[in-house]
Amino acid sequence: GGIVLGKTNIPEFAAGSHTYNNLFGTTKNPWNVKLSAGGSSGGSAAALATGMAWFATGTDLGGSLRNPASWCGIVGLRPTPGLIPHGPSATSFSNLSVNGPMARNITDLSIFLDAMVDYNNRDPLSFKKSGTSYYKNLNYFSDKLFSIGCTEDFGIFPCDKEVRDMTKNTIK
């Protein structure tokens, strides 16, 4: 079991890429309080970045786990719909929003993901566990050769020369 530490801040209706609401105000980025912690799971991301928590949960419809994670320097994962069950809801068949883990690093996130993944017969999108441990498979690719593809513009999107050059230098 887990111990509930507390609740963190989210925007009203968990809608928005900036964590602000009239009741609790704005969640500031812990690395620079002039910046946003992102949203909608900005409170969770800020709590993790400051060391207040080891794990945090969130939901993701349009980046609500991923954006605050990247803005606060932590890790957030939007899992496959059905991997982490929802339980009964009015939108049971919707795969748009998912529950997901957030953590300070990939190792912690994989431990939490192992704990969150389960089957729930009240969630029509839920599926049975495969028996795979995300934590135990973290180093699966460490001794394997693999390639990473990169595109400058997907063949259709214009990209500034400065951005293109910075991307190429980063890849090198």
Model-inferred region functions:
Residues 78-166:
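A short helix-breaking turn/cap at a secondary-structure junction
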Residues 167-171:
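Short catalytic helix/loop segments, enriched in acidic residues and glycine
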